[in-house]
Amino acid sequence: MRMKKMSAVYMGLFCMLCTVSMADVLVPYLPAYIHGSSWWQPKPGVSWQWQLSGTLDTDLDVDMYDVDLFDTSASMISLLKSQGKKVICYMSAGSWENYRDDANVFPEEVLGKYLDGWPDERWLDISRIDILGPIMLRRMDLAVEKGCDGIEPDNIDGYSNDSGFALTSEEQLTYNRWLAEAAHARNLSIGLKNDLDQVQDLVSYFDWALNEQCFQYDECDLLLPFVQAGKAVFGVEYSLSTTTFCSQANSMNFDWLKKNLSLDSWRVSCR
């Protein structure tokens, strides 16, 4: 069926909308709780703890805790902050976890293959910001409600994995930048989790980086743009001994830990 002839004004508006992505549509409506760039922007040299399992050990003399968004209560976050600590809240932004409170709001069409080694998680189709955007915004709002100073969005490198979707690097960049803008609109600090091949394109959007096992896989040089920009690089090794990586981590001005894979309370700091 042929379309009716559009007016010049309507045609102009229609064509303008054709060039606007869903990410562009969502971002202007992100609530800015606090105006200005007052969110936490750590420099290298921050002491920290990353604990996502077990009873939280709140007695460590560190500057920052990275804890689970869903499992950590607002009162626990308040306790840590009363001790002068920054609190980062972990959330997966690129995978579906079947045990989360909001697992049932993800439609099947955005659920891909299971993550290798993680039978409770499936990759998300991050090209569908129209679907995932509102879900992730609610998670960030929860972080604000609980008093988190920032978020650690995990699994934001689906394009380089066997996700079950034909994701492109550009789609990943669009999604990751959108996450950063959404976090900042809520006055939340945000870190780039892994995704090493896109560091150069994303370092200006993220406030810090968090990496797993770059010394084991000999790819830590890819994180140097963060340090060169005066931004902290946090990281962990699971298998290597501290004598293997700590001196190099310190010389690169990285803030590195030795941790158990379960990310319980045990830690050894290189600093």
Residue map of PLM features:
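Bacterial N-terminal signal peptides that target proteins for export
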Residues: R2-Y10
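Bacterial N-terminal signal peptides
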Residues: Y10-C18
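Short, cationic, amphipathic peptide segments
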Residues: L26-P28
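Glycan-processing catalytic domains of CAZymes
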Residues: L30-R271
